[in-house]
């Protein structure tokens, strides 16, 4: 929906809060980080945030909208990434000095680029959904049987997994990541 683009969202919110023509909201596209004008007074910012949250949370294509404060207050996630909640996924990529004032997450299978691509964009930085998060990593060697690791992995798991495959000892307490089962069959 083009109404979710930062430009359209800004025009709607600016009208609602009585500041038409002023750029109140900045962003890179219709999902992800949204930034408020740093020149807003505390009262103006609260009004802009309240109206923006209400509008976005009522939109049928929006899965969630989190404020910077909500994300910052969320403990860093632990455990397997496939078990994280949306706010934990947001927290895992949160950087206080650079992250937006709001994080807009669209529902699964909603493309963040409306028809007649916005700003010439043809791709995004992804989403919290498996279709964007799960990236295939292929290991192959002569005689290796096909096997799909059903559990979520992280890129830091590649090195200890390959090290184990070639018999290279790696002290587990000195590296990030874990050794993955790459061999088909039991054990």
Predicted region positions:
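Substrate-binding/catalytic groove segments of enzymes
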Residues: 111-115, 144-148, 168, 172
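Substrate-binding rim/cap in mid-to-C-terminal beta-strand-loop elements of soluble/periplasmic
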Residues: 1-46, 122-166, 181-186
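Short, surface-exposed loop/helix-turn segments at secondary-structure junctions
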Residues: 114-123
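Short, surface-exposed acidic
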Residues: 21-22, 170-175
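Acidic carboxylate-rich catalytic motifs and surrounding loops in phosphoryl-/glycosyl-chemistry enzymes
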Residues: 68-71, 173-178
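Sec-exported extracytoplasmic/periplasmic mature domains
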Residues: 57-61, 163-171, 185
């Amino acid at each position: 929906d083009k109404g979710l683009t930062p430009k359209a969202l800004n025009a709607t919110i600016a009208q609602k809060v009585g500041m038409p023509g002023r750029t109140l909201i900045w962003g890179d596209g219709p999902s992800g980080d949204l930034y408020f004008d740093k020149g807003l007074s505390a009262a103006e910012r609260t009004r802009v945030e309240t109206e923006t949250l209400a509008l976005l949370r009522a939109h049928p294509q929006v899965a969630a909208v989190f404020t910077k404060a909500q994300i910052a207050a969320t403990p860093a996630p632990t455990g397997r990434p496939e078990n994280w909640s949306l706010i934990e996924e947001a927290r895992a990529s949160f950087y206080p000095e650079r992250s937006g004032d709001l994080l807009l997450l669209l529902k699964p299978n909603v493309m963040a680029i409306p028809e007649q691509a916005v700003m010439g964009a043809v791709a995004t930085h992804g989403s919290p959904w498996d279709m964007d998060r799960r990236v295939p990593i292929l290991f192959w060697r002569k005689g290796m049987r096909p096997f799909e690791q059903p559990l979520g992995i992280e890129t830091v798991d590649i090195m200890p997994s390959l090290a184990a495959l070639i018999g290279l000892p790696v002290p587990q307490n000195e590296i990030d990541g874990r050794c993955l089962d790459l061999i088909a069959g039991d054990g």
